[in-house]
């Protein structure tokens, strides 16, 4: 059985994790856009994306003080055991 690549696995969606974390912190896409020096439309686009570019994700992690890379690593480890 072929293992699905992260791009083929709809169960892991970084954009939805970002949206949920922003909501948990009571912050908005506009606030985050200001923190990472982009326009809000880029944040809304990230919400819809299963994956987010590493440079943007790094800035988002700093702004939210949340390690999304840890989420990616946990997903990778879970995939290894499946």
Set out the residue ranges of the language-model regions:
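Residues within the alpha-helical elements of helix-turn-helix
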Residues: 24, 35, 63
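Short, basic-rich loop-to-helix N-cap that marks the start of a DNA-contacting helix
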Residues: 49-62
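Short alpha-helical "recognition helix" segments of helix-turn-helix
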Residues: 28-33
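Recognition helix of helix-turn-helix/homeodomain-like DNA-binding domains
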Residues: 37-52
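A short, Lys/Arg-rich alpha-helix, primarily the initiator
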Residues: 1-27
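Short C-terminal boundary/hinge segments that cap the last helix of small helical domains
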Residues: 65-82
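Key DNA-contacting residues within the recognition helix of helix-turn-helix
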Residues: 44-45, 58, 72
